[in-house]
């Protein structure tokens, strides 16, 4: 897992700081994101800030470790969490929290006289705004940093009814990577209808 992190994962990770000098970054819809709370000392006073690290969607969700007659699937987020200090040298890490947001993807098309000519342009414009749509759901692992949660709730004006604490793997759809694995194809597993 060390070499996989160093050669494959690490080059794809980009920390995005939010503090007095850096604006709030645009976090992508449905991507797993780490909120890393760090602490520095400024004039003798501790200063906390949050940095976001999104897990690129082109990475496989599980890293496979082959041991004799079995395969161990390690969630990619656990490898990143294990090595997150590599991104934050000489800084105290207070907490590392995984979360995922869902943005509002609804849009309506306006009717016009020349619908055919405008249709493609209007779809392109609407899809661009969709990336910046309002956050309507926040899924977070248990025991998140209250400092980070306060920032996220204020930034997205999201109430507790739309914040979901997940006590297991975030985004269970990722389990299809295991179900569809070549070792299990002929074992009699059936996808639900």
Question: Residue ranges of each PLM-predicted region?
Answer:
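N-terminal localization/anchoring segments of enzymes in phospholipid and broader phosphate metabolism
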Residues: 1-193
């Amino acid at each position: 897992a060390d070499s996989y992190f160093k050669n494959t994962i690490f080059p794809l990770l980009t920390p995005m700081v939010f503090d007095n000098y850096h604006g709030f970054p645009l976090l992508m819809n449905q991507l797993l994101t780490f909120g890393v709370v760090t602490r520095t000392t400024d004039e003798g006073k501790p200063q906390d800030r949050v940095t976001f690290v999104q897990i690129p969607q082109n990475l496989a969700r599980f890293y496979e470790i082959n041991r004799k007659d079995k395969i161990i699937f390690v969630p990619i987020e656990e490898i990143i969490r294990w090595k997150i200090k590599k991104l934050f040298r000489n800084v105290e890490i207070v907490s590392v929290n995984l979360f995922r947001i869902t943005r509002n993807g609804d849009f309506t098309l306006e009717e016009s006289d020349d619908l055919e000519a405008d249709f493609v342009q209007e779809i392109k414009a609407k899809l661009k705004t969709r990336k910046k749509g309002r956050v309507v759901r926040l899924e977070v692992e248990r025991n998140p940093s209250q400092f980070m949660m306060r920032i996220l709730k204020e930034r997205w004006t999201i109430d507790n009814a739309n914040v979901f604490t997940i006590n297991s793997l975030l985004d269970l759809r990722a389990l299809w990577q295991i179900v569809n694995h070549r070792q299990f194809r002929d074992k009699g597993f059936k996808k639900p209808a």
